[in-house]
UniProtKB/Swiss-Prot annotation:
TPR repeats: 222-255, 293-326
Chain ranges on the Cytoplasmic side, renumbered to this chain: 120-146
Any Gene Ontology biological process: cytochrome complex assembly
UniProt GO cellular component terms: plasma membrane
The protein's name: Cytochrome c-type biogenesis protein CcmH
Membrane topology of the entry: Multi-pass membrane protein
InterPro entries: C-type_cytochrome_biogenesis, CcmH/CycL/Ccl2/NrfF_N, CcmH/CycL/NrfF/Ccl2_sf, TPR-like_helical_dom_sf, TPR_CcmH_CycH, TPR_rpt
Residues annotated as signal peptide: 1-18
Keyword Zinc: no
Gene that encodes the chain: ccmH
Alphabetic keyword roster: Cell inner membrane, Cell membrane, Cytochrome c-type biogenesis, Heme, Iron, Membrane, Metal-binding, Repeat, Signal, TPR repeat, Transmembrane, Transmembrane helix
Segments passing through the bilayer: 97-119, 147-169
Family under the similarity heading: Belongs to the CcmH/CycL/Ccl2/NrfF family.
């Protein structure tokens, strides 16, 4: 076992630390298109900022989604259409010309015109009627008429404001967000209860949204970030999981759950640079605790995926030394070792 540990430590110490860029583009044109798109899309939360300028979580998610859609070969129009379908026309700074937008532009002008006409008509009427019939009561009557004059304009303005908010103010999204925030504690208790029914995908999504809102209010909650990372992994949302675990790891690099969760999220990412960064983090974890089965398992998986087959074999063999003889995982590990050995040269396999 000391020999295996020595081999594993030697392999780990021989690897250089890598520095990465978060996003990698095929060429400069694609990078420029990404910048233009993120500057043209409005953040649903920070309504005066684009998703390129906002640091909110939802803006981060949208930037990541734009990047993923671009890597899939989607055109600029297809990406904008995807965002509009999810968040409405409000998400773009240049909404399309529709009957509704025309109505919203015309209504204020009509309201001003009607209000002006009403004021003019009532003023003319007071000039004709008051001197002839009620000269001594002209001032009180004029005061009473003045309040009524503004009533039609106020009513029209309230209608315009209500319609505008309902159609462009993301009312439905705000309602869903408020419901998710209120339901988050109960959903979390249910998720942690092994006897309760498991959450479905929609409930998990609501839980993630509610937890993110709570963490915005309490950003130092390490356990909350770790739990959000687990929810993101369960949803298959790499952006949520990676960001949550990364935040927890920054808050407490010595927290093993945060470090291992972050390493796993990076390892399971579709970005090769994330995979390499995950491998470096796992090397540090192995140096700290070379008897942790979870760490060794994830390290072996990461090494195998990056074709570092010698490191993978050493980690799996270390696991075999640590696991009981009747552990069902041994058979899977032995098959993995045999598969990795096929990729080693005769000198490496000795």
């Amino acid at each position: 076992m000391r020999f295996l540990l020595g081999v594993l430590m030697l392999m780990i110490s021989g690897s250089a630390l890598a520095t990465i860029d978060v996003l990698q583009f095929k060429d400069e044109a694609q990078e420029q298109q990404f910048r233009q798109l993120t500057e043209e899309l409005r953040c649903p939360k920070c309504q005066n900022n684009s998703i390129a300028d906002s640091n909110s979580m939802i803006a981060t998610d949208l930037r990541q989604k734009v990047y993923e859609l671009m890597q899939e070969g989607k055109s600029k129009k297809e990406i904008v259409d995807y965002m509009v379908a999810r968040y409405g026309n409000f998400v773009t700074y240049d909404p399309p010309l529709t009957p509704l937008t025309v109505l919203l532009w015309v209504l204020p002008v009509v309201a001003i015109g009607i209000g002006g006409w009403v004021i003019y008509a009532r003023s003319r009427r007071r000039v004709r009627v008051v001197p002839e019939a009620f000269p001594e009561q002209s001032v009180p009557e004029g005061k009473r008429a003045g309040y009524v004059v503004y009533l039609p304009g106020i009513v029209v303005a309230l209608i315009v404001a209500g319609v505008s908010y309902y159609q462009t103010g993301n009312y439905q999204q705000v309602k869903i967000w408020q419901q998710a925030t209120a339901q988050a504690p109960a959903l979390l208790d249910r998720a942690l209860d092994p006897k309760a029914d498991p959450l479905n995908e929609e409930e998990m999504s609501r839980l993630a949204l509610g937890m993110r809102t709570q963490l915005q209010k309490n950003p130092g909650d390490i356990e909350g970030w770790i739990m959000l990372g687990r929810v993101g992994m369960a949803l298959g949302n790499a952006s949520i999981a990676t960001d949550a675990y990364a935040t927890a790891y920054r808050l407490d690099p010595k927290n093993s759950d945060a470090a291992l969760g972050y390493a796993e999220a990076l390892t399971r990412s579709s970005d090769p640079n994330d995979n390499r960064l995950g491998g470096e983090l796992l090397r540090q974890l192995v140096r700290t605790d070379h008897s942790n089965i979870r760490v060794l398992s994830m390290y072996a998986f990461n090494a195998f995926e990056q074709q570092r087959f010698g490191e993978a074999v050493a980690a799996w063999e270390m696991m075999l030394k640590l696991l009981p003889a009747n552990d069902t995982r041994r058979a899977v590990i032995e098959r993995s070792i045999a598969q990795a050995m096929q990729h080693l040269s005769p000198q490496e396999s000795k």
